Amino acid sequence: MRILLALTWLAWLGACTSIEQPRPDFADDDLPPIATAPAAGRSGGVFNAVTAWSLASDGRAYRPGDTLTVTLEETTQASKRADTKFGKNGDMAVKPGVLFGSTVPFDSSFGAKRNFDGGGSSSQQNTLRGEITVIVNQVLAGGLLQVKGEKVLSLNQGEEVMRLSGYVRQADIDTNNRVSSRRIANARIKYVGKGALSDSNSAGWLTRFFNSPWMPF
């Protein structure tokens, strides 16, 4: 009996503990590293094609290695609702009959009624605001910029990690060298937390078991 109570107590404590959840990895998202081939030029000349800036340019990113500031303006909202109702009623009555010339005092009635009323709703809303500076990784043949960047904030009780990658049109970059995240094609934005604060918001293993699809109740 004592062993059973001890096991029950340990299981109850395990449901309250915070076990580290699997975190998404921060791989390079299949983006190759920046590789800029040096332009051929004369040695000792005043003009260098690699580091030269045009007098008519406005400082916007346009070549591998340039930085670009992305303004995060992500808002998603989804909702779903379903209502189902149906019913069925049935009645049957048996009146007195005649058997062998005599009236049988048999009178009865039956009735059945079934109703179903079910409904469900689901909603989700996410908002992400902020800024992150990325680096131009590659310039495609059509002038599309392939960018990627990472920002890590180390706090006293954890760590916040943000990563962004995608493709940017040069025409969408403003004169301040900024672009909205809504204008990034194939955008992959990751924002996760690590540490004590993130672990405190995670359910224990026993709680996750009771909330899993394996529970028949």
From Swiss-Prot:
GO terms for biological process: bacterial-type flagellum-dependent cell motility. It comes from the Bacteria. GO terms for cellular component: bacterial-type flagellum basal body, distal rod, L ring; cell outer membrane. PANTHER family: FLAGELLAR L-RING PROTEIN. HAMAP family: FlgH. Assembles around the rod to form the L-ring and probably protects the motor/basal body from shearing forces during rotation. The gene is flgH2. A lipid is attached at C16 (N-palmitoyl cysteine). GO terms for molecular function: cytoskeletal motor activity. Residues 1-15 form the signal peptide. The keyword Signal applies. It is a lipid-anchor. This is Flagellar L-ring protein 2. Its main location: membrane. A lipid is attached at C16 (S-diacylglycerol cysteine). It is found in: Cell outer membrane; Bacterial flagellum basal body. The keyword Ion transport does not apply.
